[in-house]
Structure formats: structure tokens, C-alpha cells
Amino acid sequence: MRGRITMLGVSRWSEKGGSYSTIERFFNSNIDWGLLNWKFIKTHLIRKKSIYLLGGDEVVISKDGKHSYGLDRFYSSLENRVRKSLAFLNISLIGVDARKAYSLINKQIIKESKEGCVKDKSAKKSKSKKKKNKRGRPKGSGNKDKKEVELSPYLKFVQNTIKEALQWINREVNIVYFVYDGAFGNNSAVQMVKRCGLDIISKLQKNSALSFPNEEKYSGRGAPKKYGEDIDYKNLPEKHLKSDVTDEKSHIQTKIYQMEMLHRKFADRLNIVIIQKIDTITGKMTHVNLFSTDLTLGYDKIVDYYSLRFQIEFVFRDSKQYWGMEDFMNIKKTPIYNWTNLSSFMVNFAHGLRQNHAMKGMSILDLKAHCHGLKYVKEVFKLLPDLASDYLIEMVSAKIANLGAIHPSEKVA
């Protein structure tokens, strides 16, 4: 269909039985999109003996007005500002060999659950001054187990979504790693993912206070020393260097280091990969800290798996550009949920169509042009007498369906 993807637009392009009332009932019905997406992915897109990751990201949908369910002010990375919008958590299955992400489910983020608290406007500030606590550690307090952290409402929301996805996937595909951006570069998020039975691959802050494990011999007095020397990002040990490549055109030298390190706010050791880039002309230097809780994972796979997380952005791009994620005008909870999930399902559906050899090289624009052509041919032949042969219909369909396509189909649909 052309133009804005709304309920009215869908009804106009639908065949018999696709009236506006029918479309409206569809978007107000309860649909298990996660299971539906998984059934489609399992049947048409999964490759045997391939490696798959579970990835997550947030998508922000711009929305004006006042009455949309979940409407609030969220940060948009595209606009680089906070704006009035709807926010969703997306969980996707990422194929390492196919280099593609297949959306499983979108769940709406409500601001209270993201922040972890709800402001109580009725509560008044107490005028009485609180007694100041004494300096230092309270007497009799014990060490806190960093593995037994209390999850915020937002992390519980993410955890429940991951567990829901794993219920379908683990019967067919063995998922080991969960990939997320730097927002999960903290101990609470790491423990949340580990409670789901997965290892995490994410990013730490550039100035993270990492330390090498202590290698000194135990002196025999007191608790054994756990932390060794702190990391110096400008002078990384050469013994941990894994790759050193220089691009002669851009004059950028890329060094990759891998080492097991400790962070005082994390419960366990981390598999750290530092990607250092140096301008060979100016000498300017920058770096990125990636990490995984799997201490046996190689540096190349950590870099590769983390970069594959960006494939989810292409799901968002196609959902917004072609399938109505930015166009819908519904304001109630269920229709909003159905629209966002239908949009991402159509991205999976387009991947499934391209499994057909005749449509393998076609883009989404080509697929839409192809379907437009077939629709026009069908409407034209309805106006003609019943004299057209099947061969004529097939030949005309093949010609018209390829009009406007950049990569035309090799065969008639």
C-alpha cells in the first residue's frame, strides 16, 4: 500500500472482508506476537547448525497529542534530544551467519517502571532536620553479596521479557549470549541476565576503574589481596595485545587488547576487550571497552557479536519507513501494542519472501512495487470480459509487477 500506513489505509488496500470495522477489530484483539514471530522465524528463517544470539534495544516512536497510552518524554538518539514519544523494548533473535536480526517481541515501556519509582505528589517535604549519620561504616554491618542485588522495576521488566522469549526459543535453538548496549554495563544488569541463564556481551564506560587480579604472593596476614594494579588506558600491557592493524588511507591504527579484569562494583571477573584507535598523524587516541561474563570467549567474537547488535536498528528503520510504526494514529493500549508488533513482524515477513529464489535480490521497495503491480493487474482484469487466458494474465502480471522495481523479480509471483 502507498501513503501513510494507518487502519484506514490498510482497509482501502484490503481484499474482500477487509472493511474498516474488521481492521479495527483486528487491532483491538489480543495477539501473542512473540509466539507468532517465533513460529514464523522457526519455519522460514532459522538455519540448522547456525549460531544465534538474543539481543535487545529500545525504540522511540515520536507521538504528539495528550491521550496516547504510555505517552511521555523519552530520549531520541536520532534527534539527540528528549521529546514527547512512546518507548518500546525490543527483543530480537540475531543470526551470526545470516548477519540479520529477527524481531521477536516489542513491549511498551511505561515511564514509572523505567525510572523505578513513582513520584508521590501528595507527600510534603518534612521540615524537621534529619540527624546526620556518623562517618564510616556502621558498626556490625557485614559485607554485601554483589550477586544478590535487588533489581529495579525496569530490570525486572526486561528480565520477564527475556524469559518469555527463551521459553519459545530454547526448545529449538541453544541461546548462550544476550547482547545489549552500554546501558547494561553495570552489575545489576549483569546479574539480571545471569539469572536468565545467559552470559552478557555489552559495553563499559570509557573511564571504568578496572583492575588486574592480584598476582602477589599471600603475605600470611589478613585477607588475601584481591585487586592488583589499576588499568592505565594510555599504557596498556603489550602482552595482552591481540591485533594491531593500520589503515594507510585514514591513518588510523587500531589495537585490540583482551584481558581478565576486576571491577570493584561487579561481583565476578570480566572478560575485557579494549579497542584502541590512534591517529598516526596527530597522535590522538580513543578507546572502547567491551566486556563479557564468559571468560572463555575470544576477543574477535566479542567484537563481532557486539557489532551485530546494530542489526536491530535496521529492524526499527524498516518498521518505521515501510510498515507504519511511525504512522499509526491509535491511542489505546492494545492497538498500539498490535501496531508496533505488526510493523516488526512485516520486516520478518519480508525476509521470508526473499528466501524465494526469484525474490532473493529484491529490497522491500521492490517487494512493495511487485505487489502493487499485481494488485493493479487484478483490478484491470476485473473490468475485462472473461476472455483472457491464464497465459495472458500471467504474462501481463509479470510485466506490470516489475514496474518501479530496482531489482525486478525473475519470475511471476
Where are these regions (language model features)?
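Short, conserved catalytic/metal-binding motifs centered on acidic residues
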Residues: 10, 50-64, 91, 177-185, ...
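Active-site-proximal, Lys/Arg-enriched surface segment
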Residues: 27-126, 245-246, 250, 256, ...
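Short amphipathic alpha-helical "interface-anchor" segments enriched in bulky aromatics
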Residues: 60, 224, 231, 299-330
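Basic, amphipathic alpha-helical segments enriched in Lys/Arg and hydrophobic/aromatic residues
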Residues: 327-382
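Long, low-complexity C-terminal extensions of enzymes
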Residues: 367-413
